[in-house]
From Swiss-Prot:
<dbReference type="InterPro" id="IPR003682">
    <property type="entry name" value="rRNA_ssu_MeTfrase_G"/>
</dbReference>
<dbReference type="GO" id="GO:0005829">
    <property type="term" value="C:cytosol"/>
</dbReference>
<feature type="binding site">
    <location>
        <begin position="119"/>
        <end position="120"/>
    </location>
    <ligand>
        <name>S-adenosyl-L-methionine</name>
    </ligand>
</feature>
<keyword id="KW-0698">rRNA processing</keyword>
<dbReference type="Pfam" id="PF02527">
    <property type="entry name" value="GidB"/>
</dbReference>
<dbReference type="InterPro" id="IPR029063">
    <property type="entry name" value="SAM-dependent_MTases_sf"/>
</dbReference>
<keyword id="KW-0963">Cytoplasm</keyword>
<keyword id="KW-0949">S-adenosyl-L-methionine</keyword>
<keyword id="KW-0489">Methyltransferase</keyword>
<keyword id="KW-0808">Transferase</keyword>
<protein>
    <recommendedName>
        <fullName>Ribosomal RNA small subunit methyltransferase G</fullName>
        <ecNumber>2.1.1.170</ecNumber>
    </recommendedName>
</protein>
<feature type="binding site">
    <location>
        <position position="69"/>
    </location>
    <ligand>
        <name>S-adenosyl-L-methionine</name>
    </ligand>
</feature>
<feature type="binding site">
    <location>
        <position position="74"/>
    </location>
    <ligand>
        <name>S-adenosyl-L-methionine</name>
    </ligand>
</feature>
<dbReference type="GO" id="GO:0070043">
    <property type="term" value="F:rRNA (guanine-N7-)-methyltransferase activity"/>
</dbReference>
<comment type="function">
    <text>Specifically methylates the N7 position of guanine in position 527 of 16S rRNA.</text>
</comment>
<comment type="similarity">
    <text>Belongs to the methyltransferase superfamily. RNA methyltransferase RsmG family.</text>
</comment>
<feature type="binding site">
    <location>
        <position position="134"/>
    </location>
    <ligand>
        <name>S-adenosyl-L-methionine</name>
    </ligand>
</feature>
Amino acid sequence: MIFKDYDFLQNYDLKNFEEKVKIYKELLSKFNRIHNLTHLKNIDENIFDSIKILDFYDFSKAKNIADIGSGAGFPVVFLAFLLQSNFHLFEPNPKKAAFLRTLKIECELPNLHIYKEKVQEYKNTFKADIITSRALMDVKPLLEICKNLKDENTVFILWKGSEIYQELENIKDYEIFENNLRRYCILK
């Protein structure tokens, strides 16, 4: 994938990003053979899906970003390759958390913090400026389990499908951006 062709990425260090993406792909291939972390077929397409949000939302003021159910790192690992924010990844699955820790070391990402626990069990010392999640659960339960990380200024950015419209019933103050079948939902 040629990232330099995308206007929304022009202000980022794409050489460094592409080096980290290469490391990511190698590690994922290695871990997937043993631990079956993900069934995704088109990794490049999912990487693009992870960073396309930068075309719709400005992350520059976010100091702390929490990701719920980080799995194999989509979407926030790729944002962490580009942004200086502190990324807090909550992944209770030991194999997936081990993969994320290895990735942090191999890609030299001091801004990545991995928690091998459910977010609702975390005794936090920070409030997230942004909370992200990719297709983990419906919106309302997600808002509930994240209550210990959020305050009145926290923004939720969710990678969802077309079902998002039903999930947002009785919820106000949101925006949805569409890219093919993906719905990027920003809840304020």
